[in-house]
UniProtKB/Swiss-Prot annotation:
Keyword check for DNA-binding: yes
Example GO BP: galactose metabolic process
Pfam families membership: LacI, Peripla_BP_3
UniProt organism field: Streptococcus thermophilus
Source lineage: Bacteria, Bacillati, Bacillota, Bacilli, Lactobacillales
Pathway assigned in UniProt: Carbohydrate metabolism; galactose metabolism [regulation]
UniProt keyword terms in alphabetical order: Carbohydrate metabolism, DNA-binding, Galactose metabolism, Repressor, Transcription, Transcription regulation
Name of the protein described by the UniProt record: HTH-type transcriptional regulator GalR
Amino acid sequence: MATLADIAKLAGVSISTVSRVLNKDETLSVTEDTRHRILTIADEIGYTKYKTINNSKKEKYQVAIIQWVSEEHELDDIYYYNIRLGIEKRAYELDYEMLHFFNDIPSSLGEEVVGVLCIGKFSREQIAKLERLKKTLVFVDSDTLNQGHPCVTTDFENSVQSALCYLKEQGCNNIGLLIGQEKTTDATEIISDPRLRSYRNYCMEKGIYDPLFILTGDFTVQSGYELLDSKIKSGATLPDAYFAASDSLAIGALRALQENGIKVPDDIQIISFNDTTLAKQVYPPLSSVTVYTEEMGRTAMDILNKQLLAPRKIPTLTKLGTKLTLRNSTK
């Protein structure tokens, strides 16, 4: 079991300093970096006695989750559901109560709410509205460094590069992209997708970029089906492979290919993104980029908890790695 002495040794400070930091002694004069180092080490070695900001009080503090999509949409998109699940599991471990808001930003929150976790993409106007809540904010699945808030995202750029590299190594000289176009829920901003940028950069670097191989719709099975079915029926040349920016798009595309007598992976290969449970349930099972959505939520909750314990003025961007999981939609 981890002890104060263990933390003190690793942090290079006295046991007394560790104890006073963990007990939030406001009379203690230490640098922000030292305070943060002690709290981080305590987390890493499993010291849990200090875990929440209210451990000396009987009442529980609350954390609000603001989900950018509706509850109905979340049921259809396990990606955002899993992020929320990760937040809730970690919040329970840290002894916080949860409030939920779906596709809605409240005008105010009670004093018992100490922080807000914002899942999804938000416009500048929406972020300004969130800031007016006067709570500690952490964003998940969007880069809000420029707005001055800590955030957790997936390493989209390297994920796409790794998928495209694999297809190129399999002899695919022409690689298409299936992608969705999103707007913020207030419809004021079109969301720039880093996967599109990464795809373009890679293909241009390799001299294989062809804008005709990019098919844009929305992130649904139906859109994936319609995009590829229309492409096939037009008689246009198909690429050797497609990278689909979601499992849903890939599943729709797979059905269109099968209905038109095009074999996967013999005639065309597919790699999808997210690796939800659906990816392994279709035939053939999809090769997919595994995204650790639940861990994104847990990480965001940890960041919020640390901000409440020892606020840092400099915002941080935490990118989680991914893994290319190969199945039968590639050779």
